[in-house]
C-alpha cells in the first residue's frame, strides 16, 4: 500500500480525522490530504518528539495553526485548539498527523492515528 493510500483510506477515509499527513523523520511530507504543512513545520514537529518540553511550553504548529500541547513524549504529541485538535504519532521511520474538528470526538481521532502507527511499527516502519 502506498503512503498516500494510508492517508486516504486508513486516516481520512475513516471519517475520524478531516485531514492527515505522513512525514519522514527529516520533516519531508510523504503523503497528505486536506492538510498542508508550512515551511519548517515538519522539522519542528519531528524535533518536538526529541524535546517535548519545547512543544509543551510553546505549542505545536500544524498547517499554519498553533495548537496548545496537551500531551507530548517521544511517541506521541496531542494538540488542542478550540473543539478541534491534532494527533501526531511517531513510528520508526515516519510521523503520522491527524487533524480533527469539533464534529469528531478527540478519542476517535486518537484511536485511528495510534492504530495505524502501531500497524506500521509492527511492519518495520
UniProtKB/Swiss-Prot annotation:
N-acetylserine carried by residues: 2
Cellular compartment(s): Cytoplasm, Cytoskeleton
UniProt KW keywords: Acetylation, Actin-binding, Cytoplasm, Cytoskeleton
Primary site of residence: cytoplasm
Entries under Gene3D superfamilies matching the protein: Dynein light chain 2a, cytoplasmic
Record's GO cellular component terms: cell cortex; cytoskeleton
Gene Ontology MF, one: actin monomer binding
InterPro entries: PFN (IPR048278), PFN_euk (IPR005455), PFN_sf (IPR036140), Profilin_CS (IPR027310)
PROSITE patterns noted in UniProt: PROFILIN
Top-rank taxon: Eukaryota
Function in brief: Binds to actin and affects the structure of the cytoskeleton. At high concentrations, profilin prevents the polymerization of actin, whereas it enhances it at low concentrations. By binding to PIP2, it inhibits the formation of IP3 and DG.
Protein name as catalogued: Profilin-A
Species of the source: Physarum polycephalum
Taxonomic lineage of the native organism: Eukaryota, Amoebozoa, Evosea, Eumycetozoa, Myxogastria
Amino acid at each position: 500500500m502506498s503512503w498516500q493510500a494510508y492517508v486516504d483510506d486508513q486516516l481520512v477515509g475513516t471519517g475520524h480525522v478531516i485531514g492527515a499527513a505522513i512525514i519522514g523523520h527529516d520533516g519531508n511530507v510523504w503523503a497528505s490530504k486536506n492538510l498542508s504543512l508550512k515551511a519548517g513545520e515538519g522539522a519542528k514537529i519531528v524535533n518536538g518528539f526529541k524535546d517535548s518540553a519545547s512543544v509543551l511550553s510553546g505549542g505545536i504548529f500544524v498547517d499554519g495553526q498553533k495548537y496548545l500541547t496537551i500531551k507530548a513524549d517521544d511517541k506521541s504529541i496531542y494538540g488542542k485548539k478550540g473543539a478541534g485538535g491534532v494527533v501526531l504519532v511517531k513510528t520508526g521511520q515516519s510521523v503520522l498527523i491527524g487533524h480533527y474538528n469539533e464534529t469528531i470526538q478527540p478519542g476517535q481521532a486518537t484511536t485511528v492515528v495510534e492504530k495505524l502507527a502501531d500497524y506500521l511499527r509492527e511492519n518495520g516502519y
